[in-house]
């Protein structure tokens, strides 16, 4: 399991639009349709990565808590499903059901969404304000598989608390660590 850090995109960057298949309802959805009134969290995740499996339950808990404040959550899987069949849309849907996802789980078949977001690893978190300007990018918390630190979503929660109060904490930005996105071979 190779550790890959997230790419630290500049704060203030606008969220690129997309139109991706939501495997939970078998329908294409755009960012404009899914964004939250107060803010939007875009998470690059997948099914097979141990780092993602480690945080899935916490992600759902945080999403349930902050959706009440007008923040929407969107999960995207961009992995090459030919070489990583565990990340297929069918198994994505099963994963969403197993973990009781309360947010859309989108399949980025062309990987273009991961490219324009400069996503580097799974899990990777991007928090946008109501104008879809980036206010946080990075990790959920310091917990990793096997390091015995609590998986509490502390960093993401702090970023969301700042967002709710219309503030940005530039010192809070800490890269995520996870599995690299599994890029298709040309």
Question: Which role does the model predict for each range below?
Answer:
Residues 1-164, 168-173, 180-183:
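Chalcogenol-based redox active-site neighborhoods
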């Amino acid at each position: 399991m190779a550790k890959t850090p997230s790419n630290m995109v500049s704060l203030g960057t606008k969220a690129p639009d997309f139109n991706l298949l939501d495997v939970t309802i078998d329908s294409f959805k755009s960012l404009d349709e899914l964004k939250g009134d107060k803010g939007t969290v875009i998470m690059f995740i997948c099914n097979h990565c141990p780092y993602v499996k480690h945080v899935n339950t916490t992600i759902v808990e945080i999403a349930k808590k902050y959706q009440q404040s007008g923040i929407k959550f969107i999960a995207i899987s961009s992995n090459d499903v030919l070489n990583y069949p565990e990340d297929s849309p069918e198994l994505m849907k099963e994963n969403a059901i197993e973990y009781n996802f309360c947010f859309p789980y989108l399949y980025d078949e062309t990987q273009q969404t991961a490219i324009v977001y400069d996503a580097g690893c799974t899990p990777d978190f991007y928090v946008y304000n109501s104008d879809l300007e980036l206010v946080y990018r990075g990790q959920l918390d310091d917990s990793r598989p096997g390091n015995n630190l609590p998986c509490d979503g502390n960093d993401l929660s702090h970023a969301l608390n700042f967002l709710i109060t219309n503030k940005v904490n530039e010192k809070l930005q800490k890269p995520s660590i996870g599995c690299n996105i599994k890029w298709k071979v040309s």
